[in-house]
Swiss-Prot record:
The gene is hemE. Substrate binds at R21, Q22, A23, G24, R25, D71, Y148, S203, H316. It comes from Campylobacter jejuni subsp. jejuni serotype O:23/36 (strain 81-176). GO terms for cellular component: cytosol. Coiled coil: none annotated. It holds the Pfam family URO-D. This is Uroporphyrinogen decarboxylase. It is found in: Cytoplasm.
Length: 340
C-alpha cells in the first residue's frame, strides 16, 4: 500500500493523498445516506451505512486511503455520557464532568466492548476496499475528548477545562488517564478489525500553553502510541496536534507520521521534524474553493517536501460546500504532479 509505505518513509511512485473529513457533507452521495440514517449519530451506529460512506471517497475521488466514518465522541458516549448533536450547535453532553464522583460513574472497563458498530464498519470496509488502498482507524486525543466532557459542548475559551487544569490538575489527570486506557483498547480493537493505520486527532491542542500541552496532551498521546507500537509495530501511528507550530522543537517520541495543520509553515515542520517522521498535510482547506488556488498550493507543498517522506492532506477537514469537481481536481493533480 502506497500510503503505508509513505508512513514508513519507503519510496513511493507518487505522493499518496487523502483528506480529513473526506467522507462528508460536500458529497451528495454522503448526504443521501445520512438522510436515510436519520441523523449523524444513527449513521455512526449503523455499521453498513458507516462503511458505505467510508468507501465513497475511494470510489468518487480515488484517494489512497479510506478513513473509517465515526466520531471521536462515541468513546465517552459508551462510557456512559449522554451525547446528542444539535443542529447549529454541534455535540452536547447533558451531564458534563466537574467532580471525581462524576468521573467514577463512567465505565472504563466495558466501553471498548460497546463500540462493536465501529469494528463491524471497519471489517466490512476492509473487505470491500481494494488491497492497494489503506484503511485508517482513529480516535481523538484524551485532551480533546476531555474538553467536550468537561465543557459539555464545544468551547471558544475552554474556561471550565482550564479552571480544572489550574485549580484541580489531579482531577484532570485522572480524567485523561481514564480516557487513555479506554482509547488504547479501542484502537487495538480497530486494528484487529482491519485498520492498517491509526490517527490520533488533537483538534484543541492549541488551547494549551507550551508546558501544559506536553503535560496534559502530548504525553497521553505518546502513551497510546507507545502501546500500539509495542504490540503492532507494522501499524503506523499518525499524531495530529492542531495549531502548535511554536512547540515543534519538543516533539519527539515513538510514532511514525506528524500531521501538520495549515497554520504551520510546512518548511518549518520539515526542517524540525522530517528527519524523524513522515509529514502529513498541510493545504489550507479553503484553497479548494478555487482551482488556481489549488494548483498554487499543490505546487508549493510538493516543492517544499521534495525528496522528503510526505503524505498529502489538507491542514484540517474539507468544508461542506467545496465543489466535488474541485476535490477531484485536487486529488488527481497531487497524484499526477508528484509521479516520479
Amino acid at each position: 500500500m502506497i500510503f503505508i509505505d509513505a508512513c514508513f518513509k519507503k519510496p513511493t511512485p507518487y505522493t499518496p493523498i487523502w483528506m480529513m473529513r473526506q467522507a462528508g457533507r460536500y458529497l451528495p452521495e454522503y448526504m443521501e445516506v445520512r438522510k436515510q440514517a436519520g441523523d449523524f449519530l444513527s449513521l455512526c451506529k449503523d455499521y453498513k451505512k458507516a462503511s458505505e460512506v467510508s468507501l465513497q471517497p475511494i470510489d468518487i475521488l480515488d484517494v489512497d486511503a479510506a478513513i473509517i466514518f465515526s466520531d471521536i465522541l462515541v468513546v465517552p458516549l459508551e462510557m456512559g455520557m449522554n451525547l446528542r448533536f444539535e443542529k447549529g450547535e454541534g455535540p452536547i453532553f447533558d451531564n458534563p464532568i466537574s467532580t471525581l464522583e462524576d468521573l467514577e460513574k463512567l465505565d472504563d472497563q466495558n466501553a471498548h466492548k460497546k463500540l462493536n458498530y465501529v469494528y463491524d464498519a471497519l471489517k466490512l470496509t476492509r473487505e470491500k476496499l481494494s488491497q492497494n488502498k489503506a484503511l485508517i482507524g482513529f480516535c481523538g486525543s484524551p485532551w480533546t475528548i476531555a474538553t467536550y466532557m468537561i465543557e459539555g459542548s464545544g468551547s471558544k475559551n475552554y474556561a471550565k477545562c482550564k479552571k480544572m487544569l489550574y485549580q484541580n490538575p489531579e482531577l484532570l489527570h485522572k480524567i485523561l488517564n481514564k480516557l487513555t486506557q479506554v482509547l488504547k483498547l479501542y484502537l487495538e480493537e480497530q486494528i484487529k478489525a482491519g485498520a492498517n493505520a491509526i490517527q490520533i486527532f488533537d483538534s484543541w491542542a492549541s488551547a494549551l500553553e507550551y508546558d501544559k500541552f506536553f503535560e496534559f496532551s502530548f504525553n497521553y498521546m505518546l502513551e497510546i502510541s507507545n502501546f500500539i507500537k509495542s504490540k503492532y509495530p507494522n501499524i503506523p501511528v499518525i499524531l495530529f496536534p492542531k495549531g502548535i507550530s511554536g512547540y515543534l522543537d519538543r516533539i519527539d517520541g515513538n510514532f511514525d507520521v506528524f500531521g501538520v495543520d495549515w497554520s504551520t509553515p510546512l518548511d518549518l515542520a520539515r526542517d524540525k521534524l522530517s528527519h524523524k517522521y513522515t509529514l502529513q498535510g498541510n493545504m489550507e482547506p479553503c484553497r479548494l474553493y478555487d482551482k488556481n488556488a489549488i494548483k498554487e498550493g499543490v505546487e508549493k507543498i510538493l516543492k517544499t517536501m521534495q525528496n522528503k517522506a510526505h503524505i498529502f492532506n489538507l491542514g484540517h477537514g474539507i468544508l461542506p460546500d467545496i465543489p466535488v469537481e474541485n476535490a477531484k481536481y485536487f486529488i488527481k493533480l497531487v497524484q499526477e504532479s508528484s509521479a516520479k
